[in-house]
């Protein structure tokens, strides 16, 4: 693996997708080979799994099923899209990766971070990001953003009650503490222009 693998993490409404779209032009104009992708998804098989995971009517989905589906989507996306790009010296910007599973299924769903981490170690063959940016935001603020975004389709996880979203944030903060060597916490409750500038600085300071 020769490229740089940067993952962007955060609760619902933290601005991950918008941030990545703001980062792309900066690195492109610097003639850095850069690729944006997302989880679950990014390639056909994983997008199909994403559809299943996000369907509002699948409220009966059991936590282990959910965790295994995310890991399956992650595996296919990694081998089909991420690894080939890294081997061609790309900077890969990925919207979510293993830390999402630790926060959502490991902590918020109560499966245990260690168990979920082992599932994902198997799925990824211990491939970890070069750097992770965690966008921290209060759940109420993030969910309010989602409610105002008419273009965003509400998915099954968005529909969880506020206590679930609070547990997700608590889980993320534990993940940040556990993997402090590669995760940088950034306050997401600020104008997007300032957030983009701050994250560019972090990426350049840490990796470039």
Swiss-Prot record:
Q: Which GO terms describe its biological process?
A: dTDP biosynthetic process; dTTP biosynthetic process; dUDP biosynthetic process
Q: Which reaction does it catalyse?
A: dTMP + ATP = dTDP + ADP
The EC class name is transferase
**EC number(s) given by UniProt:** 2.7.4.9
Any one GO CC term of the record: cytosol
Superkingdom per UniProt: Bacteria
Q: Which GO terms describe its molecular function?
A: ATP binding; dTMP kinase activity
* Alphabetized InterPro entries for the sequence: P-loop_NTPase, Thymidylate_kin-like_dom, Thymidylate_kin_CS, Thymidylate_kinase
Query: Which amino acid positions bind ATP, per UniProt?
Result: 10-17
* Keywords assigned by UniProt, alphabetized: ATP-binding, Kinase, Nucleotide biosynthesis, Nucleotide-binding, Transferase
By its UniProt entry, which NCBIfam families does this protein fall under?
Answer: DTMP_kinase (TIGR00041)
User: What does this protein's UniProt record list under function?
Assistant: Phosphorylation of dTMP to form dTDP in both de novo and salvage pathways of dTTP synthesis.
- What does the sequence similarity comment in the record state about its family? Belongs to the thymidylate kinase family.
> What name has this protein been given in UniProt?
Thymidylate kinase
Q: Which gene encodes it?
A: tmk
């Amino acid at each position: 693996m020769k490229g740089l693998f940067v993952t962007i993490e955060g609760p619902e409404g933290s601005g991950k997708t918008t941030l990545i779209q703001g980062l792309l032009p900066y690195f492109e104009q610097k003639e850095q080979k850069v690729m944006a992708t997302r989880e679950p998804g990014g390639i056909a098989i994983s997008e199909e799994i994403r559809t299943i995971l996000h369907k509002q009517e699948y409220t009966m989905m059991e936590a282990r099923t959910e965790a295994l589906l995310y890991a399956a989507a992650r595996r296919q996306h990694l081998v089909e899209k991420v690894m080939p790009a890294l081997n061609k010296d790309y900077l890969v910007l990925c919207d979510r990766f293993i830390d999402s599973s630790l926060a959502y299924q490991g902590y918020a769903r109560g499966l245990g971070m260690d168990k979920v981490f082992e599932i994902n170690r198997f799925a990824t063959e211990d491939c970890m990001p070069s750097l992770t940016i965690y966008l921290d935001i209060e759940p109420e603020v993030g969910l309010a953003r989602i409610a105002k975004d008419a273009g965003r389709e509400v998915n099954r996880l968005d529909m969880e009650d506020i206590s679930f979203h609070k547990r997700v944030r608590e889980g993320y903060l534990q993940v940040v503490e556990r993997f402090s060597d590669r995760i940088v916490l950034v306050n997401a409750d600020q104008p997007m222009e300032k957030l983009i500038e701050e994250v560019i600085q972090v990426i350049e300071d840490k990796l470039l």
